[in-house]
């Protein structure tokens, strides 16, 4: 059976899990703490961070590291439930938005909020820096404004169908939602999209994830909040 090394409240790991679930591929989940040295895991992946997928194939195993590589790998492995649109321009747009989340959103939002709230907690890096959190939240508002503009024109982030763009988006947004970082009253278009994405079985499986010392908001598991 396939094995996915992951961390629950990690946008990259969540993307891999959603993609595998969309393709209805069975996988064994192995939780990895990214901030602890794990020699066994380091022997599997040079990056030393999740997600990493180990796939059993005839003649041995294949190891795929990183959310983008895993998502593309599982999408190309089967034609059922495609994760990219049919049109070439739409495929390019889906990949663009996925990269926007993984690079720009990650650097300007997650590097502030997830670092302060989760990484510091697990790494014993000291108290939360409130100014860093304020900066991250200001950046988050900018990104949510951009998402609102996109979703006023489309049903999904890259067009008419659920794609890798939405997988990346819901993976990032759901981690922030777990930490009660989004005031949904202010973001109705993003909320509509998020509710629809949360209703997919591939995403519902993430909503039971928990971390020691953290409590998800009441609406987190509610599909119609």
Q: In which residue ranges do the predicted regions lie?
A:
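GST-like domain detector, emphasizing the conserved glutathione-binding G-site
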Residues: 1-130, 134, 224
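Short, solvent-exposed turn/loop segments enriched in Gly/Ser/Thr/Pro and often Arg
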Residues: 7, 164, 210-211
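A generic structural-conservation signal
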Residues: 29, 160, 186, 206-207
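Positions that flank functional sites
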Residues: 34-35, 162, 212-213
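Active-site-flanking alpha-helical
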Residues: 75, 172-173, 207
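GST-like fold's C-terminal all-alpha helical module
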Residues: 101-199
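A late-sequence structural motif
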Residues: 200-201, 205
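Acidic/histidine-enriched, glycine/proline-rich intrinsically disordered or flexible terminal extensions
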Residues: 210-225
């Amino acid at each position: 059976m396939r094995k996915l090394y992951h961390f629950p409240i990690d946008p990259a790991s969540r993307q891999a899990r959603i993609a595998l679930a969309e393709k209805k591929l069975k996988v064994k989940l192995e939780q990895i703490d990214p901030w602890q040295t794990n020699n066994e895991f380091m022997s599997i992946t040079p990056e030393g961070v999740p997600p990493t997928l180990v796939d059993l194939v005839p003649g041995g195993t294949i190891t795929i590291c990183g959310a983008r590589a895993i998502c593309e790998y599982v999408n190309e492995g089967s034609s059922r439930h495609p994760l990219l649109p049919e049109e070439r321009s739409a495929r390019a747009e889906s990949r663009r938005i996925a990269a926007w989340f993984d690079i720009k959103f990650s650097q300007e939002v997650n590097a502030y909020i997830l670092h302060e709230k989760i990484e510091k907690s697990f790494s014993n890096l000291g108290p939360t820096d409130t100014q860093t959190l304020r900066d991250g939240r200001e950046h988050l508002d900018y990104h949510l404004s951009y998402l609102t503009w996109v979703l006023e024109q489309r049903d999904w982030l890259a067009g008419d169908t659920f794609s890798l763009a939405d997988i990346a988006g819901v993976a990032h947004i759901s981690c922030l939602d777990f930490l009660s970082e989004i005031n949904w009253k202010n973001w109705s278009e993003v909320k509509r999209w998020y509710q629809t994405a949360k209703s997919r079985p591939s995403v519902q499986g993430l909503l039971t994830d928990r971390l020691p010392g953290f409590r998800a908001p009441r609406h987190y598991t509610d599909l119609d909040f």
